[in-house]
UniProtKB/Swiss-Prot annotation:
One of its GO terms (molecular function) is ATP hydrolysis activity. GO terms for biological process: DNA recombination; DNA repair. Belongs to the RuvB family. This is Holliday junction branch migration complex subunit RuvB. Its EC number is 3.6.4.-. CDD domains: AAA. Residues 258-338 are annotated as: Head domain (RuvB-H). ATP binds at residues 24, 65, 68-70, 131-133, 174, 184, 221.
Length: 338
């Protein structure tokens, strides 16, 4: 299974980009959740505006779908400057980054998604750009080649990554503001679903929004995706109104259970408990048993299961907790610690 094909994947789908832009809040006051980050950003942005300076460079990290791109757009909007967007894999050569940087206006925001995937050559260009607002470029080839310095306008780099551990120390140290985005609470997701339903012109009651929010794995992108699928169900099998009962029917049909787990989550838990006695089991062994790539389990499936207390990651491997046994309706073996 391709990770982006999962209904409960936090990764963006290409066809969702237009829809996401339509429901994306423009101001910090409209942004739901991440209260600590919002409070900090509000102060930093106001201070930068008062000093008429570029905002410090910002690093946002955390699981996919939590609003890193949305926050970058909000920061640019609140600063009243332009936003240029790109991603690590697209910036293949140093010249690609140099072209972007030299076209920035003063105090503009440059947003680089998946910044951990920058090549070393591109990263080298970024260091002096971030520190001194300068870049070195080579003119000519061979013995006649020479390096010249180009001054850049002051700008703010916002880097986003789902794998902060892969960032090099020199790059990480150049960010003045760094924040880990957390999974959202149920009440925050309910607010997001209610807001999106209004923008989609979908009839929904609070209990229906709560049911969708409860199964959204703490992730706004998943909440909005589930809302659209439940809307389809409501229009075909119901009267267009999303209630708790209808949301429950729709999501059960879509195989997203009351905890937001799908078939892949259940398969991983079942393999760990039934095939390996609850562990400890190595991630490579689990990946083969589940039939998925190690990276998919490690970066996408595991974090939510760990956060919900169903799996523990130990030096000897993955271990199923008592919650996992209860969820699968399997008796915990005697003498096994939770």
């Amino acid at each position: 299974m391709i990770e982006s094909d999962r209904l409960v994947s936090g990764k963006a789908r290409s066809e969702e980009q237009v829809i996401e832009r339509a429901v994306r809040p423009k101001r910090l006051t409209d942004y739901v959740g991440q209260e600590s980050l919002k409070a900090q950003l509000s102060i930093f942005i106001e201070a930068a505006l008062k000093r008429q300076e570029a905002l410090d460079h910002v690093l946002l990290f955390g699981p996919p779908g939590l609003g890193k791109t949305t926050l970058a757009a909000i920061i640019a909007f609140e600063l009243g400057v332009g936003l240029r967007q790109t991603s690590g894999p697209i910036l293949d050569k140093a010249g690609d980054l140099a072209a972007l940087l030299t076209n920035l206006e003063p105090h503009d925001v440059l947003f680089i998604d998946e910044i951990h995937r920058l090549s070393p050559a591109v990263e080298e260009v970024l260091y002096p750009a971030m520190e001194d607002y300068q870049i070195d470029i080579m003119i000519g080839e061979g013995p006649a080649a020479r390096s010249i310095k180009l001054d850049l306008p002051p700008f703010t780099l916002i880097g986003a990554t789902t794998r902060s551990g892969l960032l090099t120390a020199p790059l990480r140290d150049r960010f003045g503001i760094s924040h880990h985005l957390q999974y959202y609470h149920h009440d925050e997701l309910t607010q997001i679903v209610m807001r999106s339903a209004k923008l989609f012109e979908v009839a929904i009651d609070k209990e229906g929004a709560e049911e969708i929010g409860r199964r959204s794995r703490g992730t706004p992108r998943i909440a909005n995706r589930l809302l659209r699928r439940v809307r389809d169900y409501a229009q075909v099998r119901g009267d267009g109104m999303i209630t708790k009962a209808l949301a429950d029917e729709a999501l059960e049909l879509l195989a997203v259970d009351h905890l937001g787990f799908d078939a892949l989550d259940r398969r991983m838990l079942l393999c760990l408990v039934e095939y390996f006695g609850g562990g400890p089991t190595g991630i490579d062994t689990l990946a083969v048993s589940v039939g998925e790539e190690r990276g998919t389990l490690e970066d996408v499936v595991e974090p939510y299961l760990i956060q919900q207390g169903f799996i523990q990651r130990t030096p000897r491997g993955r271990v199923a907790t008592e919650l996992a046994y209860q969820y699968l309706n399997i008796e915990v073996p005697d003498g096994r610690n939770s």
